[in-house]
């Protein structure tokens, strides 16, 4: 499927086809398959540090992105970082009968719901203290370049049954996706949610929250600030615990390198339309670690489409994307040799 085995095999097929035609690859390539991206890549940095001499290269090619608007080849030049937190609020020593204790005893679901509701102010800005430290406003030349892409915000939201943009007031969805940080509850649990009804005050409630980071935001500093904020917003007799999951900073590529322009021309030739430099709302930690540990930029290109259903049942990858993606990588390899 598109995220990401299909894309990996597209690159591998390009290498196989090149060798079948030319006898050897056009450059000294190291193929590196990293399978922990969805969990924050906890083993990646130690591995890169331990094998830096073997892995260091002029440039990394990463095949984990998609087409822009399903038709325009795109090279991703910036990625958001990621911070994942799990918080649990505990109250009574056991579940309580809501008729006997309701109104007198603390309800952890109410406490946690208030914390989650308070993550944003009325304008949509995140309220975690210091959250926007290191967040830069979008340069005007980049804003103009993105505007020239003519992204259809209404169609983007309409495709998933929505009409009104969320996020910070006054910012378009494309800006929110590519250049602004977010805080999003991803799941909440507590009490009884099974068949029928049980009138309980739960002993505990928990939630999973992810933060997408941009610019120079510090994941660890935000983690600590978030935890301090939660502790300050719960009642004195509530016990709060946290589990930290993945954490990785945002990353930006140096597009002044000749490799980026060479790849852009190669993709334009294959797809018959001008390739675009774009941002990405997603997080691919390995790109940032290639830069910080190995000192090399990453050229990110991919052939996924909006209807591929990433992270959903029946996720797919178009045959056209496989065939044209294979030829695209072959063109990029030829342009970079």
Where are these regions (language model features)?
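A generic structural motif
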Residues: 2, 93, 211-218, 248
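Acidic-enriched catalytic cores of C-N bond-cleaving enzymes acting on peptides and small amides
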Residues: 68, 77, 98-188, 217-239
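Short beta-strand/turn micro-motifs at beta-sheet edges
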Residues: 73-77, 194-199
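A short beta-alpha structural unit
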Residues: 211-214, 241-256
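Acidic/histidine-rich catalytic neighborhood of metal-dependent amide-processing enzymes
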Residues: 4-78
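Zn-dependent metallopeptidase/amidohydrolase metal-coordination segment
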Residues: 88, 112, 186, 201-205, ...
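Flexible glycine/proline-rich, aromatic-decorated loop/lid segments
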Residues: 74-90, 299-304
């Amino acid at each position: 499927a598109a995220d990401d085995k299909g894309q990996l095999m597209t690159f591998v097929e390009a290498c196989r086809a090149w060798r079948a035609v030319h006898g050897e690859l056009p450059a000294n390539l190291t193929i590196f398959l990293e399978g922990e991206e969805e969990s924050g890549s906890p083993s990646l940095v130690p591995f890169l540090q331990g094998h830096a001499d073997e892995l260091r290269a002029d440039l990394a090619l990463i095949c984990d992105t998609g087409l822009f608007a399903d038709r325009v080849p795109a090279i991703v030049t910036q990625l958001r970082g990621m911070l994942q937190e799990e918080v649990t609020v505990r109250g009574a020593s056991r579940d309580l009968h809501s008729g006997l204790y309701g109104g007198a005893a603390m309800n952890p679901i109410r406490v946690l719901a208030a914390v989650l509701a308070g993550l944003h102010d009325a304008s949509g800005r995140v309220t975690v203290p210091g959250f926007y430290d290191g967040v830069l406003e979008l340069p005007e030349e980049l804003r103009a370049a993105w505007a020239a892409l003519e992204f259809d915000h209404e169609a983007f939201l309409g495709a998933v049954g929505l009409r009104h943009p969320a996020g910070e007031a006054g910012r378009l969805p494309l800006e929110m996706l590519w250049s602004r940080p977010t805080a999003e509850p991803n799941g909440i649990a507590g009490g009884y949610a099974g068949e029928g009804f049980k009138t309980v005050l739960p002993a505990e409630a928990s939630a999973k929250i992810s933060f997408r980071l941009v610019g120079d935001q510090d994941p660890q500093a935000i983690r600590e600030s978030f935890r301090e904020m939660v502790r300050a917003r719960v009642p004195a007799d509530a016990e709060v615990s946290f589990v930290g999951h993945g954490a990785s900073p945002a990353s930006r590529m140096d597009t002044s390198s000749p490799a980026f322009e060479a790849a852009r021309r190669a993709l334009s030739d294959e797809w018959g339309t001008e390739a675009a430099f774009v941002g990405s709302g997603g997080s691919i930690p390995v790109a940032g670690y290639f830069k910080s540990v190995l000192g090399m930029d990453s050229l990110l290109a991919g052939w996924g489409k909006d209807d591929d259903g990433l992270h959903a049942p029946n996720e797919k990858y178009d045959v056209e994307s496989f065939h044209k993606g294979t030829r695209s990588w072959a063109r990029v390899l030829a342009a970079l040799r």
